[in-house]
Amino acid sequence: MNSGQTVGLLVLATLLTGCGTSPPRSPENICEIFREKSDWYDAAQVTQRRWGVPIQVPFAIMYQESGYRYDAKTPRKYLLWVIPWGRVSTAAGYAQAKDEVWSDYQKSTGRNWAHREDFDDAIDFVGWYMDKTTSINGVYKYDAYNQYLNYHEGWGGFRNKTYASKAWLMPTARKVQSRSDLYAQQYAGCKEDLNRGFWSRFWHWL
């Protein structure tokens, strides 16, 4: 293998690595998530400024949707219980965004290069969706319960209360609200430390 091929493979590996990373080791604690993955904290702050959403709600939604797995997909469907026949839906990535709404996001924001497997893009998508939910259905951005119902059922589905016929969905939305509340409490206790920057935190730990 010549030097040009080696460089090419290294560049390709870097690009692939950048698209998605392993889930955080402590997904139950947002402070530990940010300490492990400082780039996720940077992305969360960008999303907060761009869309006016509280940091804890997009994270609570993504925890529920994918468990922070960049390659998460819906279960497969089977023909005659044996032959793989596509998937239950086109939802994919950290945010479990479906093809159609992801395309709407790209067109609306001009982010045509965005990928569902990239965390920065995924959290920006959730922030965009939450902002639209507030505009369309008047749901407060801190209201993780109703934000999640909109996220799951779509804006029209929420208005038509399609969630009422799904006995499992409202308890799931309550879990998202509870996780959002927990994340908010945790973040309040570590925000100052996180905002000090790497070297300030390093000397603080000594």
Model regions and ranges:
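A generic structural signal for short, non-catalytic loop/turn and secondary-structure boundary residues
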Residues: 9-12, 90
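Catalytic glycan-binding domains that act on GlcNAc-containing polysaccharides
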Residues: 20-194
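Low-complexity, Gly/Ser/Thr/Pro-rich intrinsically disordered linker/tail segments
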Residues: 192-206
